[in-house]
UniProtKB/Swiss-Prot annotation:
Keyword Transferase included in the entry's annotation: no
Family: Belongs to the CobB/CobQ family. CobQ subfamily.
UniProt name for this protein: Cobyric acid synthase
InterPro entries, per the entry: Class_I_gatase-like, CobQ/CobB/MinD/ParA_Nub-bd_dom, CobQ_GATase1, CobQ_N, CobQ_synth, GATase_3, P-loop_NTPase
Active-site annotation: 331 (nucleophile), 430
Organism for this UniProt entry: Trichodesmium erythraeum (strain IMS101)
PROSITE patterns: GATASE_COBBQ
Length: 488
C-alpha cells in the first residue's frame, strides 16, 4: 500500500483541505484511496453505518475518495468537553473522559495499537492511504507522545508533504524551523513543500522558492491560491463564521453559540442557501429579532443550559418564542427545550435535576450508554411523507409528558417533536438540514411569516451539493499541485 502523509508547520495551515483534495485527485486517477488520521481532536463527529463515531473531517475525506466512511479512518477521536477534559472515542466507541495528562498515561499504548490495527485493516482494501497530521510535527514537548504525525509517517514510510500557510506571514521561517526540528529520518520522509493560501502575483515568490529548494533540497510542489473553504475548521468556528459574506438575504437565523457547541456542520446547508443569513449569537449578546433561533448540539448539555440561564439568554429565547418567534433545538438543544433534565449519576458534572427552557413537554434523563446510529425516517412535518436521513449521537433518553400538545416530527415517535403551532421544533437528528426538500419546507415557514414566496422544495440533497464542492476544491488544488515527487 502506497502512503502519503500531509503535515503542517502550524495548526490551520490547510492540511484538511489539501488532504481532501488529494483524496479526490488520486481517486480520479484510479487509485483505491482511503483517508486516515490517527488521532483527531474535533467538535464535529460523524456516525458510520456500523454505529461507530469518527471525525467529520475524515468522513468528508472518505466521500472525496469515493468510499464509505469507516471508523478505521480515524481510530482515535477526542471530543473536548470543557474543563480541560475530552471524551475519548477508540475505534468508534466511547472509552472514557480524561484530562490531557491522564490521557497519555492511560491511552497512549491503547491508541497506538488501535492505529496499527486500523492501518492493517485499511491495507487489505485500499492501495493508497492519504494521511493527515495534526498541528505541527515538530512540537518538541509533545513529540514523544504524538500519535498523529511523524510516528505514523515512519510506520508507513509515507511520502510526506509539508504545508505552510503563507497568508499568516513568516512562511519561510516556519518551513525551515519545522525541518530543523525534525529528526533526520523524519526529515528524509519530506518529499515536497506546499505553500498554501497564497494571494498575489505568483512570480513574486520565485526567488524565495529558488532559495528554499536550494537550502532544503526539497521541491516546492505547489503554491495553492486562497480557496474559500467549503468545510469548517474541525476544531473551531473561526472559518465557519467568516465563510460567507452575504450582502442581501431574505431571512436571518440566529444560532446560539454554546460554549461547548458540537456538530456545527449541521448548519453548512443553511450557510449554502443564498437567501439565508446565519448569525452566531454568544449567550451574553443581544438576541435581536431573527426569523428563527436554533439551539445546536453540545458536548455538555446541562452545563451549557446553565450558561444560558445565568446569562439571561434562556429568558430571552422564551420571550422571543412567546412573541411569535420560531425556535428549534437539535440534539442537546432539543433536550434543553424540555421541562427537566435529570443527571442522577453525575455524568455531566454534579448530580441532580435541572430545569429546562420548558418550551416542550419533555423530560430527559442522562444515561451512560451513548446512542450512535444512522437513521432513515419519514417526516410528518413541515411537509408529510418526506424521506429524511441523518444520524443520532447522544446520551440522553427523552420522554413526552403531554403527548396531546405536541406532534411527532417523524414516523419514529421519539426522534423529534413540534408544538401544535409549528413554532417550537426539537429533534435528535444531526444532518437534518442536509435533506434539501425538508430544509426548504422548513425555511418556507419562515418566509411565509415575512410574506415572501416559497422556495422550490424539489431540490437535491446537500450530499449532491457536497460532491460539486469537492470536485471544485480538487480542481483548484490539482491546477497548482505536482504530486509526482510523492508518488515516485
Amino acid at each position: 500500500m502506497k502512503a502519503i502523509m500531509v503535515v503542517g508547520t502550524t495548526s490551520h495551515a490547510g492540511k484538511s483541505l489539501i488532504t481532501t483534495a488529494i483524496c479526490r485527485i488520486l481517486s480520479r486517477r484510479g487509485w483505491k484511496v482511503t483517508p486516515f488520521k490517527g488521532q483527531n481532536m474535533a467538535l464535529n463527529s460523524y456516525v458510520t453505518s456500523t454505529g461507530g463515531e469518527m471525525g467529520h473531517a475524515q468522513a468528508v475525506q472518505a466521500w472525496a475518495a469515493g468510499v464509505t466512511p469507516a471508523i478505521e479512518m480515524n481510530p482515535i477521536l477526542l471530543k473536548p468537553q470543557g474543563d480541560m477534559t475530552s471524551q475519548v472515542i477508540i475505534k468508534g466507541k466511547a472509552s472514557g473522559t480524561v484530562g490531557a495528562v491522564d490521557y497519555y498515561q492511560q491511552y497512549f499504548d491503547i491508541g497506538w495499537n488501535a492505529i496499527q490495527e486500523s492501518l492493517e485493516t485499511l491495507s487489505q482494501e485500499f492501495n493508497m492511504i492519504v494521511c493527515e497530521g495534526a498541528g505541527s510535527p515538530a512540537e518538541i514537548n509533545l513529540k514523544h507522545r504524538d500519535l498523529t504525525n511523524m510516528r505514523v509517517a515512519k510506520h508507513l514510510n509515507a511520502s510526506t508533504i509539508l504545508v505552510v500557510d503563507i497568508d499568516r506571514g513568516g512562511a519561510f521561517a516556519h518551513i525551515i524551523g519545522t525541518l530543523e526540528l525534525l529528526e533526520p529520518e523524519e526529515r528524509n520522509l519530506i518529499k515536497g513543500i506546499v505553500i498554501n493560501k497564497f494571494r498575489g502575483q505568483r512570480s513574486l515568490l520565485d526567488s524565495g522558492i529558488h532559495w528554499l529548494e536550494k537550502k532544503t533540497n526539497i521541491p516546492v510542489i505547489g503554491v495553492i491560491p486562497w480557496i474559500n473553504e467549503a468545510f469548517p475548521a474541525e476544531d473551531s468556528l473561526s472559518i465557519l463564521e467568516q465563510r460567507y459574506n452575504k450582502h442581501t438575504t431574505d431571512i436571518t437565523i440566529a444560532i446560539i453559540r454554546l460554549p461547548r457547541i458540537s456538530n456545527f456542520t449541521d448548519f453548512e446547508p443553511l450557510e449554502a442557501e443564498s437567501s439565508v443569513k446565519i448569525k452566531y449569537i454568544h449567550p451574553n449578546d443581544s438576541l435581536g429579532d431573527p426569523d428563527a433561533i436554533i439551539i445546536p448540539g453540545t458536548k455538555t448539555t446541562i452545563n451549557d443550559l446553565l450558561v444560558l440561564q445565568k446569562s439571561g439568554m434562556a429568558e430571552a429565547i422564551k420571550s422571543y418564542q412567546s412573541s411569535g418567534g420560531i425556535v428549534m433545538g437539535i440534539c442537546g438543544g432539543f433536550q434543553m427545550l424540555g421541562e427537566v433534565l435529570i443527571d442522577s449519576q453525575g455524568l455531566e458534572g454534579k448530580q441532580g435535576e435541572y430545569k429546562g427552557l420548558e418550551l416542550l413537554p419533555l423530560i430527559t434523563t442522562i444515561t451512560p450508554k451513548k446512542i450512535a446510529s444512522q437513521r432513515q425516517v419519514i417526516a410528518n412535518y413541515p411537509l408529510g411523507n418526506l424521506p429524511v436521513i441523518g444520524y443520532e449521537i447522544h446520551q440522553g433518553r427523552t420522554i413526552v409528558t403531554k403527548p396531546d400538545i405536541v406532534k411527532p416530527l417523524f414516523n419514529d415517535y421519539d426522534l423529534g417533536f413540534v408544538d401544535s403551532y409549528d413554532s417550537i421544533w426539537g429533534n435528535y437528528l444531526h444532518g437534518i438540514f442536509d435533506n434539501g426538500s425538508w430544509r426548504r419546507s422548513w425555511l418556507n415557514i419562515l418566509r411565509h411569516k415575512r410574506g415572501l414566496n416559497s422556495l422550490p422544495t424539489s431540490i437535491s440533497n446537500y450530499r449532491e451539493q457536497r460532491e460539486i464542492i469537492l470536485d471544485s476544491i480538487a480542481d483548484k488544488v490539482n491546477e497548482h499541485l505536482d504530486l509526482k515527487p510523492v508518488l515516485t
